[in-house]
Amino acid sequence: MKYAQYVFLASIFSAVEYSLAQTCAVDSFSVKDNFDPKRYAGKWYALAKKDPEGLFLQDNISAEYTVEEDGTMTASSKGRVKLFGFWVICADMAAQYTVPDPTTPAKMYMTYQGLASYLSSGGDNYWVIDTDYDNYAITYACRSLKEDGSCDDGYSLIFSRNPRGLPPAIQRIVRQKQEEICMSGQFQPVLQSGAC
């Protein structure tokens, strides 16, 4: 009986230790090592998203990334958005990316603008948490931090090269990465019907 109690207490201690070890401080999140923008370039389709506060693309989200000769990455993206609570339109956005620290090229700063006056413009951190370049990419942005360093208002997109989805083995990788950025269970599927 004493052995069973010992095993039970040891397993509880281990679980508590693990949960305390996992931090949601944004600065602790790992990003894609040796990120290569040229391999990342091309068309991506959003399959799932965690929205920030405010207006955000709703569905049929896609992005086409291009790397210029000087290494600058740009993107043109599309997606449907609901305006004024009832008007659903396809919106076009454009973005330019800069790398503040060349030692971590997966941590970029994105300056974006809506290509119509009623769409927002601004800038966000844009981190590529993980990608295999051929199938999936997980991006992350935190707009504001809490006092403890965790994200107060952020968003994330799960991209695929194929608008139809990801194979089960890659879905497992994506779920693990969602946990690592403290967003497990917060994603909504993104409809890809070809509307935009």
Curated annotation (Swiss-Prot):
Please indicate if the UniProt record lists Magnesium as a keyword.
no
Question: How far does the signal peptide extend, from start to end residue?
Answer: 1-21
Record-level GO cellular component terms = extracellular space; interphotoreceptor matrix
The protein's GO terms of the molecular function aspect are: retinal binding; retinol binding; retinol transmembrane transporter activity
Q: Which InterPro entries match?
A: Calycin, Lipocalin_ApoD, Lipocalin_CS, Lipocln_cytosolic_FA-bd_dom, Retinol-bd/Purpurin
Pfam family name, one: Lipocalin
- Provide this UniProt record's keywords sorted from A to Z: Disulfide bond, Extracellular matrix, Retinol-binding, Secreted, Signal, Transport, Vitamin A
Where does the record place it? Answer: Secreted, Extracellular space, Extracellular matrix, Interphotoreceptor matrix
- Primary role: May be involved in the transport of retinol between the photoreceptors and the pigmented epithelium.
Which cysteines bridge via disulfide bonds?
A: C24-C182, C90-C196, C142-C151
What family does the Swiss-Prot or TrEMBL record give for this protein? Belongs to the calycin superfamily. Lipocalin family.
Q: What is this protein called?
A: Purpurin
Highest taxon in the source lineage? Eukaryota
